Amino acid sequence: MDQSEALQILKSGRSVFLTGQAGSGKTYVLKEYIKFLRGKGKLVGVTASTGVAATHLDGMTIHAWTGMGILDNLTKKDLKKIIKKKGVSLRIRNAQTLIIDEISMFSAGHLDIAEEIIRYARGTWEPFGGMQVVFCGDFFQLPPVNRCGVESMGKFAYHSRAWKELKPEVCYLTEQYRHKDQ
């Protein structure tokens, strides 16, 4: 599909996995969608799995946004401590859309942790607390780094419970824009 089709699907409010090869315009579509949402007065959680990717969108890491930091598992004690952080819980409760760029670098286990924090903070058991979620990235890149040896931390995010429950619509961008500009 082209960028305008993907934008229309995003504007419908559905949760989406935005993907395509390098140069297909994923970042452009995200930036346009963020601009659209903010123009409507919507609060957007703009995140990425890495700090570098987050800075490209003027966002923050998903680890910081959810307050999960470097946790590889989540205890009830951890969850309560995270939710007590006023900035984190307000940010999560007030966001209407969550964007996670470079999803290929975020493991299944970490996505489940982030999603559990979001549900708890929002007080609802709907996937991601009922907010629209936009995953963006290309799973043909390297898998997540597994620092701790836990199996779920080495699996791609689409293997997570959170992804399977959300059932995001796939928007595969097929047109090459980077090469057209040269």
State what each model feature region is.
Residues 1-182:
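Conserved ATP-binding/catalytic motifs of P-loop helicase motor domains
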